[in-house]
Design a protein with these regions (language model features):
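C-terminal edge beta-strand
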Residues: 111-123
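Low-complexity "stalk/linker" and mucin-like segments enriched in Ser/Thr/Pro/Ala/Gly
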Residues: 63-87
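Sequence/structural signature of beta-propeller domains
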Residues: 83, 120-450
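Extracellular/luminal low-complexity segments enriched in Ser/Thr/Pro
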Residues: 86-98
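Extracellular ectodomain surface segments
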Residues: 23-61
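C-terminal region of N-terminal signal peptides and the immediate post-cleavage residues
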Residues: 7-24, 193
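Conserved structural position at the C-terminal beta-strand
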Residues: 105-107
Length: 450
């Protein structure tokens, strides 16, 4: 018996010695909050970094062991891939809503550690396989191509510019905020942008805020200079101009108040009304690097149901930004967009334009949206390419670039502003969500030629 006891004691001591040679395993998440969508393709992932002293990280096991709301996603809906110290977690959502997922690492000796991943799933949308979600902000309002499959996206609730990979859903690769350079303490309400060479021109809405109050920062146009392309894109601040609204009002007054700009900018005037004042499109005229087309969401012309969309050419736009010269204007252009207004306008090197058309109103996003093509000639009418879907969250706000519209099957990527959308079914507007990782705008590819 004594020998038996001694033998058992020796085994016990040996086991303790072996256990003591390994530390407690650890894991960290690249983000504690993650957003996905039902039926989505290329949804965002979270990287899990694991370690255990005395052990090869590749020998550790990572699993998801619990979901707090299995109607949204079960543990079987979570995939963990990768080897070594970094693993990737992807969730395939079952339904709209929130769930907390328990991520566990198991060490080679059976010791464990856990972290909680807070997951939010938005509902399925049309064109799901052609949709991607740009996270970090829900209020996308303008976009320009950065080359190499990337785009720079502006936000009308902040002054942050974000660089995204257009092919996948996820967080921005890089961000910039030039508020201090511009001298802006509030949002500029960026609504339009266009690129000429290495210069990107950005414009605020130029209108009052939603309460009809004048906010000086919204009366801002500025430039950034681009270096690099794709994931290596970098931006530097250029110059700003803060009197374009004033120039437009003075020009309209001098021409008989044809468009009612003075009344549209008056104290108390709501900008997103049929007779309001709100800029949302910016692009250069065909073959020009000096004359810019400023596209209006409001007013329509005339300011009645069925009125035409308004473009005012700024004939010295380059000089306005480069030297602060007061803006001069050409003959205004009125386009028949079926009673809709301009929400974005973009052209390619062949002077083929796409116009995102939508309501002047600040209604919900069930109002009609359409995509038109145009050749930039004021004498020529735009042609409707397609009606855009309106049953999903978000309003169509931007088109990244324009493909060759003479080629069959050409596709364009459009982006929604989801700031007012209830993405997760709990009554919270996306702009008010407590975590930036849950905020997102949707980018969808549409075929625009037959």
């Amino acid at each position: 018996m004594i020998g038996g006891v001694l033998t058992l004691t020796a085994v016990s001591l040996g086991s303790q010695a072996q256990a003591a040679s390994y530390g407690t395993p650890s894991l960290s998440l690249s983000a504690a909050y993650l957003s996905g969508a039902v039926g989505a393709t290329a949804d965002p992932a979270v990287n899990v970094t694991v370690a255990q002293s005395g052990a090869d990280a590749g020998a550790l096991t990572v699993t998801v062991t619990k979901s707090s709301k299995t109607a949204v996603a079960t543990t079987a809906d979570v995939s963990v891939t990768g080897t070594g110290a970094t693993r990737k977690v992807v969730v395939a959502a079952r339904a709209q809503g929130y769930t907390d997922l328990t991520v566990k690492v198991t060490g080679v000796d059976g010791q464990t550690a856990t972290k909680t991943l807070h997951y939010a799933a938005s509902a399925a949308v049309q064109y799901a396989s052609d949709s991607r979600y740009f996270t970090g902000s829900s209020d996308a309002s303008a976009a320009v191509d950065a080359g190499g499959g990337y785009t720079i996206v502006a936000d009308d609730e902040s002054n942050v510019l974000r660089l995204y990979d257009r092919s996948v859903s996820g967080a921005p690769v890089r961000t910039w905020d030039f508020s201090s350079n511009i001298g802006a303490s509030k949002e500029i309400d960026i609504e339009g942008a266009t690129r000429v060479g290495d210069t990107i021109y950005w414009t605020g809405s130029l209108g009052n805020n939603k309460d009809g109050e004048y906010k000086a920062d919204r009366n801002t146009v500025f430039t950034t200079t681009v270096t690099g392309s794709g994931a290596s894109t970098a931006l530097a601040y250029g110059r700003s101009y803060k009197k374009l609204r004033d120039n437009l009002v003075a020009w309209d007054k001098a021409n008989g108040n044809r468009y009612g700009f003075a009344a549209g900018t008056a104290d108390g005037q709501i900008p997103k009304e049929i007779n309001g004042f709100n800029v949302e499109g910016l692009e250069f005229a065909p073959g020009s690097t000096t004359t810019a087309y400023v596209g209006f969401r409001a007013p329509l012309s005339p300011a009645v149901t069925g009125g035409k969309a308004l473009i005012v050419p700024v004939t010295n736009f380059d000089k306005v930004l480069s030297s602060g010269t007061a803006a001069t204007f050409g003959t205004p252009i009125e386009l028949d967009l079926g009673g809709l207004a301009i929400r974005d306008i973009r052209k390619n090197a062949s002077n083929q334009y796409l116009i995102v058309a939508g309501s002047w109103a600040a209604d919900d996003n069930s109002d009609p949206y359409a995509l038109y093509s145009w050749d930039g000639d004021p004498a020529h009418a735009p042609v409707k390419r397609l009606d855009l879907p309106t049953s999903d969250p978000g309003g169509w706000e931007a088109v990244v670039d324009v493909p060759d519209l003479t080629v069959s099957g050409a596709r364009a990527q459009l982006i929604t502003d989801d700031g007012s959308a209830d993405l997760y079914g709990d009554g919270t507007e996306a702009k008010d969500l407590t975590h930036d990782e849950w905020k997102k705008s949707r980018a969808t590819w549409f075929t625009v030629t037959n």
